[in-house]
Amino acid sequence: INKWSEKVEKGKIDTPVDGLVINYDDTEYASTGTVTGHHATRAGLAFKWQDEVAVTLLDHIEWSCAASVITPVAIFDPVFLEGTTVTRASLCNISEMDRLGIGEDKHTKLKIIKANKIIPKCVGVVSAQGHYTIPKVCPVCQSKAKILVGGDGKTKTLHCINTTCPAKNLRRLARFVSRQGMNIDGLSIKKLVILINKGYITGYSSIYELYQYEKQLY
C-alpha cells in the first residue's frame, strides 16, 4: 500500500487512478467468504486516495436554471486538478452556500477538489469577501424566482415559478436529442442547460437554428 501510495503522490503512474484494490491470491479461500450487493466475495479491500486540493480565487457566481431549479455555480481562476483544468464548480443550493460561508467578491479564496476524481466541487472557503446575492428572477425567462425549503425543513433551493419557462423543457429536450430520439451528437444535458440559459434553445425547432449563434459558440 505504501509503495503504490508513494507512486501516486509523486506522479509516477502514467494512467490516472482513483484508488487501490487488494485481493487474496487464493480463489478457493476467497470463495468461502460472504458476498455483498456489489461484489461476488469479500476477498478484497478497496482504498481511495486522498483528494487533491487546489486553492483559487472566485471570479463570480453564475446562476443556472434547469427543470425549474436555479443552481449557483462558482466561476473561478483556472486550476489544474487530476489531469484537467477546472474553472467552475456547482455550489448545489443556497443552504450549501451558507454552510461554506462563501462570499461573492473576486478576493474570495476557495478550496476545490474533483469528487471521485471527476466532478469539480467546492469543499471550503479559505477567506470570504463580501456576501452573495440571491437573484430575484429566473436567468432564463426573467420570471419571479422563489426560495423553497425541502422536506427536511432545512435545505433551501431557488426555483423559477413560471410554469412555461423554457428550462422546464430540459427533460423533454434531452429525450428528443438522445439516441432513442433524434440521435443528435454533442448535445449532452450539460450542454443543453448552457444553451437554454443563454436563450439559444427555447424549444425543439430552435435546436436546428443554432447556426445563428455559430460565432458565440465557437
What are these regions (language model features)?
Residues I1-Y218:
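RNA/tRNA-interacting regions in translation and RNA-turnover enzymes
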